[in-house]
Amino acid sequence: CTKGFDIKLEPGKTILDKDIILKPSDIYTMSKVILEETCVKRVGCMSGPNLAREIANQHPAATVIASKFEEVIREGESAIRSKRLQVYSNHDIYAVELAGVLKNSMALAAGALGGLGYGQNAMAFLITRGLGEIIRLATAMGADRQAFLGLAGIGDLVATCTSPMSRNYTVGARLAKGETLQQIIETSSEVAEGIKTVSISKKLADSTGIKLPIIQYIYKALFEGLNVEEALRYLMEYRWGYDADYM
């Protein structure tokens, strides 16, 4: 399953250090780690709008199994497909992994909107422009944009951004209500992957010149103490330009 991505750093360094410069080749997804650090030659991943509680309660759902190897996809499908879980395939494992990771940043922002009490217009705005940032960043990292228009991309993004059950949504909501990131981390029993995702994405954007205004201001709210309402004000004043400019 897609749980996140990471980078290799020198001892004593952190992603928040200002002198860290990231290139797309510095980013490690789970499959890349497995292929480089073990003897495994065939890997796959599962990603999609798969909120665990709903699946456990037998609500209808669908997922994507991605692998370069057809036999890995077939094996995964035979293991999990049921009358309540539909399975789709994709051969671009890297894009599917990135889709599953990058959506967590937008879930933080969605939670912040929810915490401020805003409605569906604001959420639709965020999801649509957030998808654009995800696609811009992922294509700069070498992924194909097609996967982001399916279940693993827009499907997972919608589910995660609209569900209070999402860990990342919860962090964003608490941040909007005045808690600091440190307070949230100290009182949370689960890890919100979006926190690290935001820091890596922002650093990569700084290094490559990719415009990611939503991620930039989520970062400022998380790590630099910017008030969430103030972050939203900056985004509402941002000159977005052409609609669907990521296609």
Residue spans for each PLM region:
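Short, small-residue-enriched loops and turns at beta-alpha junctions
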Residues: 5-7, 96-97, 190-191
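Short glycine-/small-residue-rich Rossmann-like dinucleotide-binding loops
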Residues: 3, 67-68, 163
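NAD(P)-dependent Rossmann-like dehydrogenase/reductase catalytic/cofactor-binding core
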Residues: 103, 110-114, 139-149, 153-247
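Short beta-strands and strand-loop turn motifs
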Residues: 1-2, 46, 90, 184, ...
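Rossmann-like NAD(P)(H) cofactor-binding subdomain of soluble oxidoreductases
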Residues: 1-57
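Internal alpha-helical scaffold of NAD(P)-dependent oxidoreductase catalytic cores
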Residues: 33-43, 60-147
